[in-house]
Each structure stands twice: as structure tokens, then as C-alpha cells.
Amino acid sequence: ISTTALTHGNSQKKDKDNKKSISEKTKEEVKNIQDYYIRDSEIAWLQDKWIYDILQPLIREANDKAGWHYDLETAEQIQFTVYKPGGLYGWHSDGQQDIANAYRRYFEGISIEKKINGELPPKFVKQNHLIGQVRKISMTCNLSLPNEYTGGNLKFDFGPHHMGERYHEVKEIRPQGSVVVFPSWLPHCVTPIETGVRYSLVLWSLGRPLR
């Protein structure tokens, strides 16, 4: 899929359960995935222009048609993700949209509690173009065929005050090549893979913090 990629595993387990792999657990044991694992997947980072050229227009279209009208300035590297049997991603949001979060990911020693007042801390990192930016829109693109895996659905939590259903599993994107675009603050998870392997692309569009 890509001419250049940096690959590594991404498995984060809570201390209380670090002796048992997710594949060894029963469905009952993983029914509350946040109690056991934050994430269990393999990822690679892609920077191919032709992939951006396909995905970014879809994000801009969704930003307009959904009425979000976020000011977008740049994008992160594209994440290629592999979820194998037992793989999952617990409940999370892709980023908060405040000024502290815009800086703390990119500098050593910066925490959400530290006041920044718009000034850059002294230690820079390689991702200079991302400094001061926050994730505003997230996109997931399914690369697998529907019959190649079971489980592994993207699931949203719209909150207790949502007029409709609070939780929704996005089975609409199971057809290969389907995409879903959503605000990065929206809580979501990937349910455990039961059989097969799920491949996906994830892209985040960024802009200045909301005021």
C-alpha cells in the first residue's frame, strides 16, 4: 500500500492484567474492554501523497456538509492499523481541542496542568508543523472485505443526553473502501476482533485550538 512506512506494535496493557494476553481471554473477560486494555494492534505510519489526495477531499466534504466548518490547516501522518484476533482499542477520544493539548504532546515535561500562555516551551521536536495544532476531524477507512473478519467494529458513544441511541456500532463501513468521518473529540472504540484480521487507515485533520 505504501512505498515508505514506519512500523511497530502498539499494545498497551493495564498493570493489573499484564500476565495474560488478550487472545487468551474469554468473551466474558473482555466484555468491558477498558478494564483490561487500552489498545492491542499493530500500526505503520504512511506519508504517501497519493493517499492524502484521496482521503483529504472526503474530510473537507464532510466538514462542510455536516455543518462543522472547522478551520483545518494540516494533517498528521496516515496510520495503517492491523487488528488481529483479540485486538481492540478501548474507549478514547482522538484529542481535546484546547490550547494546552495543542502543545503538550510535542514537548518534554509539558502536562495538561502547566500553563502555556501561548508561548512555546524551549524543547522542540521533529513534528514542528504540528505544534500548536489540535486534532479536529478523524477519518477511518476500512481496507478489509466484510467476510474477512468478525467483530472489530468502530463504536461511538454519543453521551447520556443524546436524543437518539447513545451507542452505535458503525457496521455501515464494513464494505471495503468505506469511510467514516467524525469530530475528533467524540468518544469511540474498536470492539474485539473475534476471527480474521481487520486492516484500516486512520487520518486526523488539525487546526488551531477552538476559542
Residue ranges, per PLM feature:
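Fe(II)/2-oxoglutarate oxygenase catalytic core
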Residues: 1-181, 185-211
